[in-house]
């Protein structure tokens, strides 16, 4: 059953109190060493986030390094031709991302924006990407909510509201903002995303050695593999058939 956020907060208040601290402790011991983690340069973080929108970390790693070697800052990307940008994007697919990067770089006039509203207004940047950039680069208290975050929150708090429904998006966005450690938003956002990617995975999560197992609702209720929930949509496919009707007046005897 869907829960209003007020009811959700009342129901899980104790769990909320230990959630972020436990994640940060886990992250200190298990964080992944990624090149975009070792910088607070908003431009470099922006490039990494756009690459990772449709590309797995392992695949995007080398492409990121190659791209920023040729385009190390806003000015160099803005000054390049679209053909050259496409050349360095080749292999990543979803080329609209590269076109949006190029257009956004030109709109910046040499300086990366410094407010959430300005970052969110960049072409190709949505709520998640804006929150990630602002928290990682500027340590602003915005919760970045991606697939990993939906999964971790849904399982830990035992929430069965469909994550792709309007109500689900509102519920999880509000919850993500509530459990965010506002004194360490960059570390917290990276922690919960890494936790979802490494520990609380879609298939075969490592519940046996999970630091949150003692207070995880999905684990205690035997619903780990059932969460998060998505809306059931029946996919319809139109199929067309051609028929040939042959009629013959002749009769064959023999």
What is each stretch, according to the model?
Residues 249-254:
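Conserved small/polar residues in nucleotide/adenosyl-binding loops
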Residues 4-7, 11-12:
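Short, positively charged and aromatic/hydrophobic N-terminal segments
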Residues 233-236:
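Short Gly/Pro-enriched turn/cap motifs at secondary-structure boundaries
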Residues 15-206, 212-221, 225, 238:
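Catalytic cores of DNA base-excision repair glycosylases
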Residues 242-246:
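Short beta-strand scaffold segments in enzyme catalytic cores
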């Amino acid at each position: 059953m869907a829960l209003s956020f007020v009811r959700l907060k009342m129901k899980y208040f104790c769990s909320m109190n230990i959630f972020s601290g436990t994640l940060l402790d886990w992250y200190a011991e298990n964080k992944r060493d990624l090149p975009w983690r070792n910088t607070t340069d908003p431009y470099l973080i922006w490039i990494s986030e756009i690459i990772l929108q449709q590309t797995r970390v392992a695949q995007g790693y080398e492409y990121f390094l190659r791209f920023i070697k040729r385009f190390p800052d806003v000015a160099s990307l803005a000054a390049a031709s679209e053909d050259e940008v496409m050349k360095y994007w080749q292999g990543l697919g979803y080329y609209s991302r590269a076109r949006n990067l190029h257009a956004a770089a030109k709109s910046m006039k040499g300086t990366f924006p410094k407010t959430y509203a300005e970052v969110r207004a960049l072409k190709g940047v949505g709520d998640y990407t804006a929150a990630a950039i602002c928290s990682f680069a500027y340590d602003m208290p915005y919760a970045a909510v991606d697939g990993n975050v939906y999964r971790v929150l849904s399982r830990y708090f035992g929430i069965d509201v469909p994550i792709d429904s309007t109500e689900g998006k509102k519920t999880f966005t509000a919850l993500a903002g509530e459990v965010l450690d506002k004194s360490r938003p960059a570390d917290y956002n990276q922690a919960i995303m890494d936790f979802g990617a490494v520990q609380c995975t879609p298939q075969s999560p490592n519940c046996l050695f999970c630091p949150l197992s003692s207070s995880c609702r999905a684990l205690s209720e035997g619903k780990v593999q059932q969460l998060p929930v998505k809306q059931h949509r029946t996919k319809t496919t139109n199929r067309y058939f051609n028929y040939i009707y042959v009629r013959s007046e002749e009769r064959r005897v023999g």
